[in-house]
Amino acid sequence: MRLVIGISGASGVVLGYHMLKVLRFFPECETHLVISEGAKLTFGLETDLKIEDVEKLADFVYSNTNLAASISSGSFKTDGMIVIPCSMKTLSGIATGYAENLLIRAADVCLKENRKVVLVPREMPFGKLHIRNMKEASDLGCVIIPPLLTFYNNPQTIEEQINHIIGKILMQFGLEHEKFKAWEGTKDD
């Protein structure tokens, strides 16, 4: 399996970091990483992580300005892409096909090649334009998975919440995250 991981400048870049950490447990999964400049700034604001440490988790790393990278072409086969978190600017670019950088171009390529694209939009509250762009992206074939809190899995920590979100995303690619607690119904089922 070959996945493109895009980390854009929305709040919640730690979600992208955790996604890369979890994907390391799937040796069959080759990861291709693009980090936007906004995301690099957000890592500095929200975490103590160094960009180099995030990049080390990926098999391949690309500059967001390199529109000639392998992942910018449909002939480079992938199983899809995850944009985590997905800023509203990136969402807008994907929804309208305005591929001004590699992250958006890679998503555009996945869509034109009928490959799965999962967007994890991080904004609150969503404005009408955000919702319209999510609908447009969904109509194009994107799966929209906002990183919402869940409670049926009885989480006790932020890490458990993050693992649940990661698990929901990985399900889209047929991967099972061992720390994901699926709903098993009530005891009366």
Curated annotation (Swiss-Prot):
Pfam families named among the record's database cross-references: Flavoprotein
Reported induction: By 4-hydroxybenzoate and 3,4-dihydroxybenzoate.
Single Gene Ontology BP annotation: catabolic process
EC supergroup of this enzyme: transferase
Signal sequence, start to end: none
Enzyme Commission number, as recorded: 2.5.1.129
Residues annotated as binding FMN: 9-11, 36, 87-90, 122
Keywords assigned: Aromatic hydrocarbons catabolism, Detoxification, Flavoprotein, FMN, Prenyltransferase, Transferase
HAMAP family: ubiX_pad (MF_01984), ubiX_pad_yclB (MF_01986)
Subunit structure comment from the entry: Homododecamer.
Additional remark text: It is not known, if phenolic acid decarboxylase forms a complex composed of ShdB, ShdC and ShdD. The term subunit is often used in reference to the operon, however there is no experimental evidence to prove the existence of the complex.
PANTHER family reported in the protein's UniProt record: FLAVIN PRENYLTRANSFERASE, FLAVIN PRENYLTRANSFERASE PAD1, MITOCHONDRIAL
Similarity section: Belongs to the UbiX/PAD1 family. YclB subfamily.
Function summary: Involved in the non-oxidative decarboxylation and detoxification of phenolic derivatives under anaerobic conditions. Flavin prenyltransferase that catalyzes the synthesis of the prenylated FMN cofactor (prenyl-FMN) for phenolic acid decarboxylase.
Protein name from the UniProt record: Probable UbiX-like flavin prenyltransferase
Gene: shdB
